Design a protein with these regions (language model features):
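Cell-wall glycan-active module
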Residues: 2-3, 9, 25-389
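Bacterial N-terminal signal peptides
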Residues: 13-24
Length: 389
């Protein structure tokens, strides 16, 4: 099993020592300072996959690792190393393989992956929105038969759709130029994820601080590039503190949202103590209503045992999307009760039981399935990288 986060020594010295990757176009790589005797000894004791590598060496190893069919292997290698180094992460096999495993699972190392039947998916979205406004499909088709900025009609472009980037661009054009486009979609582009790691556009826009590349048009557009998709995907995997026993849970969080695995474990503990069955989905409060959800109601039923008011419970649960939740009295008191009742320490991380839903998904898949698949790929990558010098 892989550790959940890179080991560290002095934070500032470690950044200077390990983060030596530079952006494409730089003439040369800076020489990192030599480690102290103590740091060198500590590094030597780490598992090989956790030991830092020189950025230039890692790039050449990534090029040799990537499958034959991958286009522009040096570009991939540079983007991965840049993503790690500019986010203060150690350039080592474990971190590189975590990023590559997600990229392989999500898009098989394609910067702009082809989605089968995307034109039909787009029409379904358009017609569904039109139906809500009582607009007949033939009226929509007629409206979209006009020429778009590319010279082709919107309808023809939709029929020929192959990638989410193309789909996003069409909706941008429609919203900006077609009166009905504004009526159907307002200013909200319905394409929410994309790129080589299928990152949420909303996530990228909320976590753009420190992005090392020039933003040509918008963060949305950057998500659909290889460099942007990899940078924001890396941010999604490692960009938050989480005391997980294994990276498996970070992979689950990549799919279900930050701290979903921690929150699912809390829900399991609440269910044990309260005796009330709960869906282990990682959602501690309802985001669609001010009314308490099932998790909050279950905690209410043990309010006297955790010695907290309903208001205090609610305020604690609102911290469920941050690291601070694990510092709350509610978190510690619930787990104290659960550990005591079980006679042993209960897991602080559990794979969320979430059904994956998307027009692109045609099988019965779950977050746990996704996390385990990525974890298998990461471990296979680490084993292969160990043979590449």
């Amino acid at each position: 099993m892989s550790p959940s986060r890179p080991l560290s020594f002095s934070p500032w010295r470690l950044c200077a020592l390990l983060a030596a990757a530079v952006l494409a176009g730089c003439a040369s790589e800076p020489t990192p300072p030599s480690p102290t005797v103590e740091e060198a000894a500590a590094i030597a004791k780490q598992p090989r996959a956790m030991q830092p590598r020189k950025p230039a060496d890692m790039k050449s190893r990534i090029v040799r690792f990537l499958p034959r069919q991958v286009q522009d292997k040096p570009g991939w290698a540079n983007d991965v190393v840049t993503a790690l180094s500019t986010q203060g992460l150690t350039v080592n096999d474990h971190n590189v393989c975590s990023v590559l495993a997600v990229a392989e699972q999500e898009a098989t190392y394609q910067a702009d992956p082809v989605v089968p039947g995307l034109g039909k998916i787009a029409w379904k979205e358009i017609n569904a929105r039109a139906a809500k406004l009582l607009i007949p499909e033939f009226v929509v088709r007629t409206a979209l038969s006009i020429k778009s900025p590319t010279g082709k009609s919107y309808a023809a472009r939709i029929d020929a759709l192959r990638t989410e980037r193309e789909m996003s661009e069409i909706f941008e054009d429609m919203i900006g130029a077609v009166p009905m486009g504004k009526q159907l979609f307002g200013n909200l582009n319905p394409v929410r994820t994309g790129g080589p790691m299928q990152v949420s556009v909303a996530f990228a826009e909320a976590n753009a601080r420190g992005y090392p590349y020039p933003v040509k048009e918008s963060i949305r557009h950057e998500v659909f590039t290889r460099r942007g998709g990899i940078w924001f995907g890396t941010k999604h995997i490692f960009g938050y503190p989480a005391d997980y026993p294994d990276t498996l849970y970070r992979f689950a969080d990549f799919n279900a949202g930050w701290y979903a695995s921690r929150n699912a474990a809390f829900q399991a503990a609440v269910s044990r103590v309260s005796g009330k069955p709960l869906a282990l989905d990682g959602d501690l409060v309802r985001y669609d209503s001010d009314l308490p959800g099932k998790t909050e109601l279950a905690v209410h039923s043990i309010a006297s045992r955790v010695n907290m008011s309903k208001q205090a419970i609610h305020q604690s649960l609102l911290k469920g999307d941050s690291a601070d939740f694990a510092k709350t009295d509610l978190y510690h008191r619930v787990f104290t009760l659960a550990d005591r009742q079980a006679g042993k320490r209960q897991p602080r991380a559990v794979l969320p039981g979430i059904q994956l839903k998307s027009p692109k998904i045609t099988r019965n898949l779950t977050t746990a399935w996704f996390a385990k698949r990525v974890d298998d790929r990461e471990q296979a990558c680490v084993r292969k990288m160990a043979t590449i010098r």
